[in-house]
A protein has these predicted regions:
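Bacterial N-terminal signal peptides that target proteins for export
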Residues: 1-11
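Short, low-complexity interaction segments enriched in Ser/Thr/Pro/Gly
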Residues: 5, 24-26
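Bacterial N-terminal signal peptides
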Residues: 9-20
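Extracytoplasmic metal-acquisition and chelation regions
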Residues: 26-182
């Protein structure tokens, strides 16, 4: 039995080596950071299991005047894509984004027709909460899908399918409301 200690050492070394090696199937997920939770929810529906989606802000946070932390900057710097709303919703974002290098950003409100604000200090300006319109929400989904497909082409088919399913779910949810209003 003199070989038993050597066998145990060999097995232990082999097991430790196997644990430290990263197999091809354990590839890290594509990392997406959004400026707030609504976009994170939409992006998660489009990404499914193909990407890891997180929001800079937490639920209930004041999105307009948010004060990013150093941890927010660090997390965003580790992303492979940042999704923002635009339309002057995230007043803090331009300065925040200057602290990042090499992380692409896509404004998911591109192409929407925002309603105008008709009173108060923002009278005449576009309402930045454009996702609240069903038609605009579908544009957001398309923009998120296109961004994910562009920056993570290996999972393009997944993003395409998930976006199609998510849009159908949105339309199905809204169909009874449209029927009542028409």
């Amino acid at each position: 039995m003199p070989h038993l200690p050597h066998l145990k050492s060999f097995l232990l070394a082999s097991a430790l080596t196997a644990l430290t090696l990263s197999p091809a199937w354990a590839k890290e997920k594509f990392k997406v950071v959004t400026t707030f939770t609504v976009i994170a929810d939409m992006a998660s529906n489009v990404a499914g299991d193909a990407a890891e989606v997180s929001s800079i802000t937490k639920p209930g946070a004041e999105i307009h005047e948010y004060q990013p932390t150093p941890g927010d900057i660090k997390r965003a710097q580790g992303a492979q894509l940042i999704l923002s709303n635009g339309l002057n919703l995230e007043l803090w974002f331009a300065r925040f984004y200057q602290n990042l290098s090499g992380v692409p950003e896509v404004m998911v409100s591109n192409g929407v027709q925002p309603m105008g604000i008709s009173e108060g200090p923002y009278n005449g300006k576009p309402n930045p909460h454009a996702w609240m319109s069903a038609e605009n929400a579908l544009i957001y989904v398309d923009n998120i899908r296109d961004a994910l497909m562009k920056y993570d082409p290996d999972n393009a088919a997944t993003y395409q399918k998930n976006a199609q399913n998510y849009k159908a779910k949105i339309q199905q949810t809204l169909a009874p409301l449209h029927a009542e209003l028409v």
